[in-house]
Amino acid sequence: MPSTRVLVADANSTDGTPDIVMSFADRLLVEVIPGGLPSVGRNAGASRADTPYVLFMDADIEPASPSLIRRAVELAASKHLHCVTTNILCRGGSLTDKLLYASNDVFQYLSRLHRPFATGMFMLFDRRRFNELGGFHEQVHFAEDYLLSSRVERSRFGIVRGGVYTTNRRFEKMGHFRVAKLFISTALNYWNESFFLRDHKYWQS
């Protein structure tokens, strides 16, 4: 891990994130770079990568197993996959929170039959294929992860066993009904890029 380059895209945070990140510089090859909305920050990090794979992870998630990242890379390499994701787990949330995240996981597995869906919380990409696809669409402010992963061939998409822990913060801010409605609308509009380009006020919530 000390030789693994970690790039943290910071969108002008005011909570001391850059200082916290750099406090690990004696143990990790870490760097803070200018960020923005998720698609902008992720593309900025990917443009600096020179490895065969690039892993996108949200700042508020935690791998459920220390071996998760290693297993994701091994799965991608052994099966020549272009994109690998994992299950999303909610620790400490309500039963409704857990059910909605479980529904997300079920949708991910079913997506392998139609159009792959990977959440940006944990998305391992073959860097060459990522660049060929043009990266994340920077004019899309919601579900940019789904829009990109849906362009991956089904045979090149995988889900590694295990998962990452996340919080119920988005449910608390937006409400379960609105999040579920937006998720379903997104799934039904997979073919309609103009839907993704609309302002769904996701980040204003």
Residue ranges and their predicted role:
Residues 2-12, 31-34:
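Short beta-strand/loop segment that forms part of the nucleotide-sugar
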Residues 10-18, 61-62:
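A conserved acidic beta->alpha catalytic loop
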Residues 33-49:
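Glycine-rich, basic loop-to-helix element that forms the pyrophosphate-binding segment
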Residues 54:
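Short aromatic/hydrophobic "clamp" motif used to bind/position activated sugar donors
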Residues 88-95, 106-125:
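A recurrent flexible, glycine/aromatic-enriched loop bordering the glycosyltransferase active site
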Residues 142-148:
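Acidic donor-binding loop at a coil-to-helix junction in glycosyltransferase catalytic cores
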Residues 153-205:
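Hydrophobic helical membrane-anchoring modules
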